[in-house]
Amino acid sequence: MEEFQGYLEFDGARQHNFLYPFFFRESIYVLAYDHGLNRLNRNRSIFLENAGYDTKYSSLIVKRLIFRIYEQNHLIISTNDFSQNPFFGHTNHFYYQTISALFAVIVEIPFSLRLVSSFGGKQLAKSYNLQSIHSIFPFLEDKLSHLNYVLDVLIPYPIHLEILVQTLRYRVKDASSLHLLRFCLYEYWNWKNFYTQKKSILNTKFFLFLYNCHVCEYESIFFFLRKRSSHLRSTSSGVLFERIFFYRKIEHLLKVFVNNFQDILGLFKDPFIHYVRYHGKCILAAKDTPLLMNKWKYYFVNLWQWHFSVWFQWQKVHINKLSKDNLDFLGYLSSLRLNPLVVRSQMLENSFLIDNVRKEFDTKIPICSIIGSFAKEKFCNVLGYPISKSTWMDSSDSDILDRFVRICRNLSHYHSGSSKKKNLYRIKYILRLSCVKTLARKHKSTVRAFLKRLGSVLLEEFLTGEEQVLSLIFSRGYSPSQRFYRVRIWYLDIIYLNDLVNHE
């Protein structure tokens, strides 16, 4: 937020949430330019003057863009203008790409200001551990053992761009900016290009913001239904069509229900409900009966279809019983394992046995999916038999070894929370043997002869990093290599999924 304060003065626009005037400020373009350079140089910024000045900001191009926005009549532009008319050496493709880049930066301003003001000047505590993907698994270990059902939901994408604009309208009260956004979406992108274009980092950021607004709108309604679930019935879905004054309508609805329909209320409020969203999916875990879980499934489907006008199939919502079904969650197959226990109890002179069952959170590695990813990347065949990586044979030996070691350590790091390490051993075996076959093929040697010459060096490279990490976790009184294979380890520094893990 400090970078916004350095470029802008918010007092006028902040009061009315006007975003449109920001499109005419050169400082905003400088801010968008800085964001473009901070993307690891994976693409050139659209505000650069020419290819010979990769770090030079062009004020002339910015002035021309501002003039074009100011003079443009968005109501009379045709599709032919979009594809043919040049603009100072640039096409309208460049013009709309710039608008999307600016909108991605400008629209963050009111949300950031709202977040800062909500803390009342207090310093926001930073917890980097909560940013880790693994931080959710200790929570599930503690909570899922008391629950029995999980709804696995695939969040649908909006099938029409107008739905995204309408969703943003609930949070941005600036009609001019929304009209400009709607115009750019319809003129620059068709539906297919909007969802598949990933070459431009700025457009991807722009899409992610619209999608997150769409999901936040859905979650705000869902959480409201969750809190009021003891009063709301499926017959009341008609009042949810309009988001404006939503809470006022729902409060009025509750008063009517309480006063006039007290005898027919369906009370099914359950405090043991947990919600997690990840990678376009969400799970709803609860301690409910199958009937109540089907009710929640019914609410999900109707919320998307009738409120968001998105076609949502029943097959996209799965009801999993944790004691029987596996939940495919963030690269793990999670379930509840029932461990029978026999306890001997003695009372005075009589002794008897008590049969008990303990629930444990079980996490397994989806080995079939990972082998499929390995086969796609040519580390092994479809049966899991290691093969040489022919596309890497032009690299140096140290580079090839470093690539295999890095992949092996990343996967071992991520799947260290597995309950059983057998599948983890298989992953390491495939990568190590694939590495040996790649190097042996490069040097036109057999695997046996190559291992006799450099086998100890390869084994040391693969094991050194893992032993160093484990030695920091366990005390000296234990053997890290032995403890590692008996317990689950959750690392709090993992902020993204490896492509081989994210097989979807």
UniProtKB/Swiss-Prot annotation:
Predominant localisation class: plastid
Pfam families per record: Intron_maturas2, MatK_N
Residue ranges crossing the lipid bilayer per the database entry: none
A cellular component annotation (GO) from this entry: chloroplast
Compartments in which it is found: Plastid, Chloroplast
One biological process term in Gene Ontology: tRNA processing
Function text: Usually encoded in the trnK tRNA gene intron. Probably assists in splicing its own and other chloroplast group II introns.
Matches recorded under HAMAP family: MatK
Protein name: Maturase K
The species this protein was found in: Cynophalla hastata
